Each structure stands twice: as C-alpha cells, then as structure tokens.
C-alpha cells in the first residue's frame, strides 16, 4: 500500500514540479537575502527528492542553476563595468566579488544530493567538501568566464598601482589588493594546480613591479646617502616588503610566494651592490663598528657566498692586529710569561667580543676567529723555539716553532708554585687563571712541547715541595685530561702524584725505624723520594758528584731499608734532583741556606778550611763535578741576583761562568749576611736554588731532542696503523688522516712527513703503486 502511494506521488517529485519552489530560494541566496529555516530545509528536501525520483532531474537542476548564476553574474558585471576609472572599477569589482565569494560557500550546501548523483557511487564514499563542490565550481567558473577573464588585466594593473603608491607612502584600503589576489587563487579550474593562474599572473606581476621599483630607487639612494646609510635603507625595505608580502601574497603552505618575493628584493637591494657594501667591511672591523657590521652580516647572509669575504676580512684583521699588538709588547712579554699570557687572553677576549656583538656568535665567524687566533698563537716570528735533531751524529735544527707552549707552561708554573703571584691570589683566582691557560692551549699546535715543559716544572715543584696548592695541582691533571691531552701523558702525571704520596709513607716508616738509632744525619732531617722511572722518565745521563760524608753514609741505610720492603727493585740515585738546607755561620750571624746537592758539595769544600782561597781546578777535584755543572753552580754562589752580599767571593772578576779559568780563586765571604730594608739581619733563610734547573745542559738538549724523536716515532707508528687498516691509500688521504689524529699533540712538518714515508718504503712497510706513484700499498 505504501509503495503504491509513493508511485502515485512520483509524478509530483519531477524537476518541473519542484523548480518553481526551489528557484526563489536560490535567487535569494545569490543576492544574499534572508532565507527562513523552513525555506532552507525545503530546498534540501526538494533537491533530494528530484535527484532520487527524476532520472533527468540532476542534469536539469545543474542547467537551471547555471542559467540563474549566469544571469546573476551578468547583473554584477553590468554594475562593475559601469565604472570607467580603473580604481573605481577595482573597488566595484571587490564589492561584488566579496558578496559572490561568500555565497560560493553557502549555496552548494543544499545541493549535496546533486553532487552524489552526478558523481556516482565513487563520490558517495568521499567526505563532503564545499571546496570540491560541483555547484561551487560552477559558480566560480561562470564568474571567471563572464567577468574576471575580461577585466583581470585592468584589475591587476590597478592593484599593482596601489602597491606602488603604498611604497611611496600613500594610504589606501588594502582589501582591494587582497580581493584581486583571492580572485586569482580561487578562480583556477585546473584541479592539478589550483594556484597556476595566481602564480602566472598576480604573483609574477607583483614580483616584477617590486623589482622594477627597487632597481630604480636603490641606486639613487646609495649614490646620495653612501653605503652605511644605504645598508639601513636596504634592511628597512626588506622588513617592510616581507610584511607587505604577508598581506598581499598567498601564504598557504604549498605556495612559496613570500620566499620568491624576498629573493627578488634581496637581488635588487643587496646582491646588485654586494661588492660596494663589502668594500666597507674591513674598515668597519678595524674601527670595531659592531652595529654596522651586524647590519652588514644580516644583509650578506641572505646573499649566496656573501659571508665568505667577511670571514676573510675578519681572519686577516685578527692575524694582523693580533701580531701587531704582540710585536708592540714584545720587549715585555718575551721575558715575562705572565704578561705574555695576559696579552694573548686580552686579544682572545677582544676578538670574541667583536664576533659576539657584530655576528651574534655565528658558528662561521667563530670558526674564522679560531683559525686566525690559532695563527697568532703559533706564529714564530717573535718567539722562536728551535728543536735540535741529531741524525747520524750530525746536529740539525727543525723548522722554528712558536715559543707559546713553553711560555704557557712557565705561566702555569708561576701559578702553581709558591711565588709572589700565587701568594697574592686566592685558590679560586688561581683556578680561573689556569682555566684561561687551558683555553689558549686549545689553539696551540704543538701541545707536546707544552707537555714536556709542564712536566719538567711539575717535577721541580714536587721534588722541592714548592707547590702553592696540592689540590689544584692534582685538579690540573684532570683538566688537562678534559681538554684532550693524550691519555698516556696525563696518566704519567697522575702517577707522579702517587709516587709522592707513597714516598711520604716510606719516609714515615724510615723515621720510625731509626728514631732511636744514631745515623750520620738525624732521621727526622731526611726526606726520601722514591720515584718510578717510567712516570718521571729522567735522562739516562748520570752526573757524578762527591758527596759529603754525612750523605754518603746515609745512602746504604736507605737502600737496605727499601730492599726489605721491596725486594727485587733497584734504586738509582739522582743527586742532580736532590736538595737540602745547610746552616752558614760567620761573625755577622747564622743563616739557613736552601741549596742543591751540587751547591752543597761546593760549599762543603770549605768546611775544614773556612778562610782559604780554593782554585777552580781544586774545586773540580774536590767535588768531581763535570766542568759545565761546576761553572753553573759556582756562578749561582758568586752572582745570586737576590743577594747584595754573595756567599762566595772570587778573583779575578769575569762577566760569565764561561770565563772562569783553572786559576780562578774562590773564597767564603766572611761578611756574608742577609739585608732587609737596608739593615743587616743576624738571622734568616735564603733559597739559593732559585731557577736552577734540576737538569744538566746536556739533559736539556736531550729533552728538546726527545720531543722531536717522539714526534718521529708517533708519526711512524700512526702511518703503519693507517696503512694496516686501509691497505691502499692516496698520499693526500694518508696525510689528512695523520694530521687529524695528531692535531691534539702537534702539527707534523711536511719535511718530517716526507722523510717518514721514505723510511717506511725503505724498510718495506709500504710501497708505491706501480700505476700511481702518489698511492701507497701496505706490505704485510
């Protein structure tokens, strides 16, 4: 019965029956007139009914809609074209377009069933999307064909004129330009590229007009106002154009209009004047004009390869200014390691501040700073260190190196040793200054030289017990580890501290054992240091000296005590590294003298004959010291800089220890005394060890030669390791890998690299490739 009624009503559900009810509502919607809820729902219902019951209904609805939409648009077209003036036409168009475009989102909604029917089953599974609506497409296509395609050039030109006027400071309604853009964006019928019409027309016109504007404006502004004012102008215009582009150009994700516009502006405002702007860079750096440099940096960073010339200028400035300052202060800093380090740190802080303020610590400029500062630190023109190298009995010299690592080690020693400098600083201040040294050390190429000198100073501090702060001493070892010093070196330093602690326990045990025994010297007055040869690595050279009887008799006692606790180990006595305190008595007073073993041996020659004059020749026989060591020791007793009255007198007078002859006579100064504030002190203590090295002249030469030999061995060893792993490698790649591994210790010289390659070939570790002499092959 229900089916029969539906079939009876089917006749009343035809298009012809319903359109007369539907059309008034459609026209109201097109004209943006109010529609009641009932009318709105009726339209949905009627469209649904016609699409279901009238086979030709959907096509008829589509055609009828098209006709009504076209008619509505023709009326709008007439209103727009009634204006002859381009600006008036643009305003009229935008008014009509805004109303129509709003309805493009509303009118399609009641026609959902039409969409489903016309698109078939496939479409029925898709989510309803107004933007993809057939009705919406019909509305936009009709608008495009009837109005927009005919006047789009006039609209576009008007819009560009408005933008041009805005650039010149004139005000207008920005919605006029935005409306034209929206028309271009929304009226494209190409489903594959909905922005094609917009890109080909509006975007292109916008970019072209922008470029034309600045190609005209920029050169004249530069000519009239100069580079520095022009940079401000260019920066302001780039920011202004970016804001304008965000208003007037399409900003959706798939569109890169703003980026294209900014590239266009950069080309017109910056790239075209790149050389002219960059020509000012060097002068700005010299004058420390950080604000102007920052502005130049922000502009040049937008230009391909714009930063490279600035980096080059910065590097050149740091090197030239840095070396100029070092040369200007050379007289002071070459003799004062504290002043030298302070000068380097002042330079580093100055250049770092420049990079921070001008370039915002940009990594590229930090790298340039590091590269240039490294060149200053490692420059050898002012401070040369020549390392000797003996080959087949012939003394050679390597290429001069910077003395920086040696001076850094000396400064560390001043901070870590009991000195006037360390005494006036707190522990925190000493720590801060050591951290500053480590900062500079990062830039030192030949860190192995620093290591050698630092270890020599540490040896001296530990043996003489003159460290200012033992905790900071041990912390320094860990800091060196943290900054990437080789582990084998740092481990040896740590072992040195262990030896000192073990020696303290041994001393305590020795004193306990002999507290009731009578020794040549009281046990309490003896301090023994047993050092591991591997960690302390002293020279193999033994310097013989004839010891006073008291010391000579003590040695067997110590050896016997040590063997009881450590069987199988042999002690080698290094008198060169020993020191002690002796009491000097004369008619003036009594004084304690801190002396080396060599000084002690010389002074004890007068114990039985205090008022006699002894010749250089007889002192050599009495002490059995080598000639060079005796001369050095005697000079420290006759010309000690801190004493107004020397311990020994001599005749005839000479200018240096080298001028002593076999007949030079020495005697004890019976009027020796310590003078303080112009007053003679009857008692006191003086350290005569001073800066006497705990090494002989020959041992110092060996130390320096050892640096070179160790470099050769490390280079050779690494070459073999690399070749073993690579099997076959080019000369360039081999050298690159070698330098990369060794850079934390030293920078191998080209001559050394070449010599070691030849050595490896000669000893059949590697061979040259027959087809390419610059390629090496590993030989097992």
Curated annotation (Swiss-Prot):
One of its GO terms (cellular component) is Cul5-RING ubiquitin ligase complex. It comes from the Eukaryota. Kidney collecting tubules. Residues 713-772 form the Cullin neddylation domain. Neddylated; which enhances the ubiquitination activity of ECS complexes and prevents binding of the inhibitor CAND1. Deneddylated via its interaction with the COP9 signalosome (CSN). Its main location: nucleus. Keywords: Isopeptide bond, Nucleus, Phosphoprotein, Receptor, Ubl conjugation, Ubl conjugation pathway. Core component of multiple cullin-5-RING E3 ubiquitin-protein ligase complexes (ECS complexes, also named CRL5 complexes), which mediate the ubiquitination and subsequent proteasomal degradation of target proteins. Acts a scaffold protein that contributes to catalysis through positioning of the substrate and the ubiquitin-conjugating enzyme. The functional specificity of the E3 ubiquitin-protein ligase complex depends on the variable SOCS box-containing substrate recognition component. This is Cullin-5. It comes from Oryctolagus cuniculus (Rabbit).
């Amino acid at each position: 019965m229900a089916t029969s009624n539906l079939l009876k009503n089917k006749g009343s559900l035809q298009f012809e029956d319903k359109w007369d009810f539907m059309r008034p509502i459609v026209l109201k919607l097109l004209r943006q007139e109010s529609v009641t809820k009932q009318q709105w729902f009726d339209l949905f219902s009627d469209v649904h009914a016609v699409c279901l019951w009238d086979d030709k209904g959907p096509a008829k609805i589509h055609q009828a809609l098209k006709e009504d939409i076209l008619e509505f648009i023709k009326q709008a077209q007439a209103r727009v074209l009634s204006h002859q003036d381009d600006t008036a036409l643009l305003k009229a168009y935008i008014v009509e377009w805004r109303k129509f475009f709003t309805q493009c989102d509303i009118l399609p909604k009641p026609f959902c069933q039409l969409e489903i029917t016309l698109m078939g089953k496939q479409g029925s599974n898709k989510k309803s999307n107004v933007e993809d609506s057939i009705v919406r497409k019909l509305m936009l296509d009709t608008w495009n064909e009837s109005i927009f395609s005919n006047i789009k050039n006039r609209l576009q030109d008007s819009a560009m004129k408005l933008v041009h006027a805005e650039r010149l400071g004139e005000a207008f309604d920005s919605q006029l330009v935005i409306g034209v853009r929206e028309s271009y964006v929304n009226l494209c019928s190409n489903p594959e590229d909905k922005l094609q019409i917009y890109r080909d027309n509006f975007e292109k016109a916008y970019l072209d007009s922008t470029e034309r504007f600045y190609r005209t404006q920029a050169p004249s502004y530069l000519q009239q106002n100069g580079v520095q004012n022009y940079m401000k102008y260019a920066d302001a215009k780039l920011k202004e154009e970016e804001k304008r582009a965000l208003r007037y150009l399409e900003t959706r994700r798939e569109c890169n209009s703003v980026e294209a516009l900014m590239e266009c502006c950069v080309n017109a405002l910056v790239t075209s004047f790149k050389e002219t702007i960059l020509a000012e860079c060097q002068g700005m750096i010299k004058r420390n004009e950080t604000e102007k440099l920052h502005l130049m940096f922000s502009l040049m960073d937008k230009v391909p390869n714009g930063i490279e010339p600035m980096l080059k200028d910065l590097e050149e400035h740091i090197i030239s200014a840095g070396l100029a300052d070092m040369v200007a202060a050379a007289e002071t800093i070459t003799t004062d390691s504290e002043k030298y380090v302070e000068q380097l740190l002042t330079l580093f802080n100055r250049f770092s501040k420049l990079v921070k303020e001008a370039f915002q610590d940009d990594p590229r400029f930090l790298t340039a700073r590091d590269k240039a500062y490294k060149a200053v630190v490692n420059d050898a023109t002012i401070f040369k260190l020549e390392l000797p190298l003996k080959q087949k009995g012939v003394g050679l010299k390597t290429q001069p190196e910077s003395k920086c690592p040696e001076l850094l080690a000396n400064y560390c020693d001043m901070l870590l040793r009991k000195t006037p400098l360390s005494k006036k600083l707190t522990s925190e201040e000493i720590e801060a200054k050591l951290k500053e040294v480590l900062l500079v050390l990062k830039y030192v190429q030949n860190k192995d030289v620093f290591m050698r000198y630092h270890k020599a100073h540490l040896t001296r501090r530990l043996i003489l017990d003159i460290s200012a702060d033992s905790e900071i001493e041990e912390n320094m070892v860990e800091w060196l580890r943290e900054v990437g010093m080789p582990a084998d070196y740092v481990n040896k330093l740590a072992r040195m501290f262990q030896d000192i602690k073990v020696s303290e326990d041994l001393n305590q045990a020795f004193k306990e054992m002999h507290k009731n025994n009578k020794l040549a010297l009281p046990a309490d007055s003896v301090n023994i240091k047993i050092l591991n040869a591997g960690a302390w690595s002293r020279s193999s050279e033994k310097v013989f000296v004839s010891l006073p009887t008291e010391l000579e008799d003590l040695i067997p006692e110590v050896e016997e005590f040590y063997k009881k606790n450590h069987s199988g180990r042999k002690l080698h006595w290094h008198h060169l590294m020993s020191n002690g305190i002796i009491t000097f008595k004369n008619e003036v007073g009594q004084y304690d003298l801190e002396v080396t073993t060599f000084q002690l041996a010389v002074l004890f020659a007068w114990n039985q004959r205090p008022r006699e004059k002894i010749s250089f020749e007889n002192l050599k026989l009495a002490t059995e010291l080598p000639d060079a060591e005796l001369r050095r020791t005697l000079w420290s007793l006759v010309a000690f800089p801190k004493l107004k009255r020397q311990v020994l007198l001599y005749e005839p007078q000479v200018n240096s220890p080298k001028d002593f002859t076999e007949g030079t006579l020495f005697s004890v100064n019976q009027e020796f005394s310590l003078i303080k504030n112009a007053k003679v002190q009857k008692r006191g203590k003086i350290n005569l060890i001073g800066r006497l090295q705990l090494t002989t002249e020959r041992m110092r030469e060996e130390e320096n030669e050892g640096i070179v030999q160790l470099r050769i061995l490390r280079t050779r060893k690494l070459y073999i390791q690399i070749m073993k792993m690579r099997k076959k490698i080019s000369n360039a790649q081999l050298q690159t890998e070698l330098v990369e591994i060794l850079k934390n210790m030293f920078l191998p010289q080209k001559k050394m690299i070449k010599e070691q390659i030849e050595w490896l070939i000669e000893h059949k570790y590697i061979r040259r490739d027959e087809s390419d002499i610059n390629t090496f092959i590993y030989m097992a």
